[in-house]
Amino acid sequence: MAGNESALSRAIEAETVNRVELYAAALIPNRLSGAPEEVIQEVTARQSLNWNPSSPISARTLTIAAENRLERIDEAILICSPPSIRSRASMIPLSDVEIMINDNIKGWFFLVKELAAIFTARKRGTLALVFPDISSSGKDDNADVLGPSALASFRALTQGLLAAAHSEPYITVGFSHTDAGNETAFAAYIFKILDEISGKAKGKMFKFGKFSFFK
């Protein structure tokens, strides 16, 4: 699994621990200005793999390291839940713009390319892309200047991959939720679907919300 350090990624990692004996995780800490250094260090220390999203070489190194750790990659879960930047446009530090683009937009394209190459060569595998459909406040956050842009890019990437999924030898699925604060249930829902996944699910978008358990 790879993704932003967030309530969503923590819930998915916790569910992963309960379901598998061995996994590999690369989490992106919030490196925006004002983020507590101790939190960045804590996230970096507990992840099993290092990843610099701005580097295509790092994406390849990450997948090689994951294969060495796990022997092979059967399933990859990518989680985009970018941090918020609540600031007047004129006051946003240029460094934060660069970090947001590198960590929350550009890196996903590099990593998806590497994973797709692995799954294509093996002619099997599951690529799951996960994102929230709303902000962490539970409604669209108009005060967040850059977070929604990063999320929109990941959503568009997901939609493109799902549209092309039927021509690929591996399975690509998407997951989104509109139930902020219920990340634990969403994580359980994701793994319930993945546990039962088949080729018929190729290109499908699974949406978690109030009525998901009745689908």
Predicted regions and their residues:
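C-terminal helical subdomain
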Residues: 152, 163-215
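Short, aromatic/basic amphipathic alpha-helical patches
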Residues: 11-15, 34-43, 149, 153-161
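Conserved internal alpha-helix within the Rossmann fold of NAD(P)-dependent oxidoreductases
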Residues: 59, 73, 107-112, 183-186, ...
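Residue-level signal for alpha-helix termini/capping positions
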Residues: 16, 67-68, 120-121, 166, ...
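Conserved mid-core segment of classical short-chain dehydrogenase/reductases
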Residues: 46-71, 78-103
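Catalytic loop of short-chain dehydrogenase/reductase
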Residues: 81-111, 117-166, 176-179
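Hydrophobic/aromatic beta-strand patches that form the interior of the parallel beta-sheet core
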Residues: 23-25, 47-49, 77, 128, ...
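Canonical Rossmann dinucleotide-binding motif of NAD(H)/NADP(H)-dependent dehydrogenases/reductases
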Residues: 1-35
